[in-house]
Regions:
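Nucleotide-sugar donor-binding/catalytic module of glycosyltransferases
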Residues: 1-120
Length: 120
């Protein structure tokens, strides 16, 4: 069965997470609050020693757009690659777990990419 274009996210947001218990809620809240609704959020728990992994699971239970990968610590680069392996979006945006973005960030970026027919 082919996935319809309607159900396929336009933007995949990948967030490598490592010991970000103090910051991850603000980050995820900023992603969940995007004006562009056609997104998926991939949280890659890179073997956190704090409560980050549990928080990621809680976010995924609250929102079907959020997917979580748990893995042994291997660094941010490999965590990003693991997120890319499951990303379904036409465009990919990487956000660090201690960052947050404005509500219209994904909408503005994707509008520009579509308008300019950007080929990356």
């Amino acid at each position: 069965m082919m996935e319809s274009a309607i159900s396929k996210p336009l933007v995949s947001i990948i967030v490598p997470v490592y010991n970000a218990e103090r910051y991850i809620k603000r980050c995820v809240d900023s992603l969940r609050g995007q004006t562009l609704q056609n997104i998926e959020i991939i949280l890659v728990d890179d073997g956190s020693k704090d409560n980050s992994g549990c928080l990621c699971d809680e976010f995924a239970q609250q929102d079907s757009k959020i997917h979580v990968i748990h893995k042994q610590n291997a660094g941010q680069g490999l965590a990003r690659n693991d997120g890319l392996n499951i990303a379904k979006g036409r465009y990919v945006l990487f956000i660090d777990s201690d960052d947050f973005i404005e509500p219209d960030t994904c909408e503005k970026l994707s509008d520009r990419m579509e308008r300019e027919q950007a080929d990356l």
